[in-house]
Amino acid sequence: MLTDIEISRQASLQPIESIATAFGILPHELSPYGRTKAKVDLAITNRIKDNKHGKLVIVTAVTPTPFGEGKTVTSIGLTQGLQAIGKKSCACIRQPSMGPVFGIKGGAAGGGLAQVVPMEDLNLHLTGDIHAVTSAHNLAAAAIDARLYHEQRLGCEAFREQSGLAPLDIDPEKILWRRVVDQNERSLRTITVGLGEVNGPVHQGGFDISAASELMAILALSRDLKDLRARIGRIVLAQNKQGDYISAEDLGVAGAMTAIMSQAISPTLMQTLSGAPCLIHAGPFANIAHGNSSIIADDIALRLADIVVTEGGFGSDMGFEKFCNIKTRQSGNAPDAAVLVVTVKALKSHNPDAGSEMDKLAAGYANLSWHISNVAKYGLPLVVAINRFAEDTQEELEWLKARVLQEGVFACEVCEAFTQGAEGAMALARAVVRATEQPSQFRYLYETKQSIEAKLLTIAEAGYGANGISLSDTAKAQLAQLQRQGFDKLALCIAKTPMSVSHDPKLKGAPQGFELPIAELKLNAGAGFITALVGKVMTMPGLGIRPGYLNIDIDERGEITGLA
């Protein structure tokens, strides 16, 4: 079979204007970036606001292996399958970060015959939204250090007289806003800023990957430009020497940050290999952020399509949980059904020494059972999609499907979208249509009015199967500060490893009885949630020993090779 990029390059693509017209987007609501992608103007929302509201399907997965289990392949394949059975469908996915593209995981355009194309456009830059997030974020970092430098250089009163601004009295030891870059770069996790006599007071800093920026979460959760501006103004950047929070509005940088992101607020329209529309917007990671594409993209798609397919990053303990408890709270768009993607290889990875291949599959089934139970907590009709790989045997697939159906899920189908495209996902599509016609009893896992500790305990015990939580001294102090400043009624975003339903990547299957260690609590006032860093989670990934960039090149005709 051809590689993903070879398939993408050989595809017969429609002009993006044709995709838009068929989907219901008018010419003046489109700003093309070349022939195959375009920004969708937010003015469309007023025109379509009274259209019938479509059905929303959230795609999630079991605990993944490092290379992923084909959740995006299944999402794109399902969208194509829905189109093939006569449903007007649209996929809403995140913009890939270039960190994983050049690292081990590769791109996030799907794969095989279930791709968003051109895949190289999607995986490299797209329409520049991540660059806008990065620039706006780092402007705030520069503004903090500049203010700190000038106030310390002049003294508060002289600064007030010369600048006409009120001193902020920033505590250099309590700057909360790190810098970001869209790369995996472990050497930047901890840095020293301000070295040299004229470069400002020396203090510790660091870089996160751009997908971890609060601005990325804000982009994904904003309803319009006005909301984006207000949220950016609420971002907490630092504390003053009295312990009070300093916001982007206080620093006077919120307007400029929003101006940088003014084009990024519009989603990008692309197409799948079968010509189905796909809206790409925002790219927060699910392990260190909330892991879902934008509310704006969903809102547009739901007023134009019969069924909208979106996905949450990693397993159901990660992006799906945050979709339900963070995104849905803010959007008001409750899902109508869920699809849980599983692979034979993922289940085998939980017990690789169990004996025969069937023994490994049976031993690893506990992980799938855990995720089925987890989705059930939210009251959604569930379809399990077995994403077939070439090495899967018929015996394994039949055993797995029969076992899944014993769990009481709505349906279970084998998906072969990777090798067959729309045709390989039609059975899944029909099952999903039937699932969306069932009554949904969607519910949240916790109420935001609970205390921070109570919410943490609920997520740990009901969400992960833990036996309680522990808070570090740092987390305890931060919790007290959040309560004191009135931020204790926000939703929670757990940042943890995606390789286990626990905090420990070595705990495979369906671990129980562990204590969830809360290392740090970080306020994301603009995004509207508190991030709890659990265990040893990193907000800046590193490159592996054989990174993906080693395979990537470009020839004299401008054709990229080796992009996965």
Swiss-Prot record:
Domain of life: Bacteria
Matches recorded under InterPro entries: Formate_THF_ligase, Formate_THF_ligase_CS, P-loop_NTPase
Protein name (record): Formate--tetrahydrofolate ligase
Lineage, opening ranks: Bacteria, Pseudomonadati, Pseudomonadota, Gammaproteobacteria, Alteromonadales
Protein family according to the UniProt entry: Belongs to the formate--tetrahydrofolate ligase family.
Record bears the keyword ATP-binding: yes
PROSITE patterns assigned to the protein according to its UniProt record, in alphabetical order: FTHFS_1
rRNA-binding in keyword set: no
Catalytic activity: (6S)-5,6,7,8-tetrahydrofolate + formate + ATP = (6R)-10-formyltetrahydrofolate + ADP + phosphate
Pfam (any one): FTHFS
Biological processes annotated in GO: tetrahydrofolate interconversion
Protein residues bound to ATP: T65, P66, F67, G68, E69, G70, K71, T72
